[in-house]
Curated annotation (Swiss-Prot):
HAMAP family linked to this entry: Ribosomal_bS18
Keywords, sorted A to Z: Ribonucleoprotein, Ribosomal protein, RNA-binding, rRNA-binding
Protein family membership: Belongs to the bacterial ribosomal protein bS18 family.
Keyword Ribonucleoprotein assigned: yes
Name of the featured protein: Small ribosomal subunit protein bS18
UniProt cross-references to Pfam families, sorted A to Z: Ribosomal_S18 (PF01084)
Cellular component annotations (GO), alphabetically ordered: cytosolic small ribosomal subunit
GO process terms (BP): translation
Subunit structure as annotated in this protein's UniProt entry: Part of the 30S ribosomal subunit. Forms a tight heterodimer with protein bS6.
Function: Binds as a heterodimer with protein bS6 to the central domain of the 16S rRNA, where it helps stabilize the platform of the 30S subunit.
Gene Ontology MF: a single term: small ribosomal subunit rRNA binding
Amino acid sequence: MLQRKPKYNSDYSDARSKKRKRCPFTAAGIREIDYKDIDTLTKFITERGKILPRRITGVSAYHQKKLTAAIKRARHVALLPFVAEV
């Protein structure tokens, strides 16, 4: 007789039960994100210049919108590059 495989893989459920990342802005008590603070903004963009998504950084939806606006504003005033040099 055939052996049935378990419906759920226990290794998969253990990997999925990681602790959620906490928003670094909320943890530090930062309410507004300054577009002139390049050191903070560069932590949330890739080496190619793309904005990192929330699921990678753990930023809240509120702060992700503010962060995106600040990065775009910094790009327009030439504080950040639009694309990285290849």
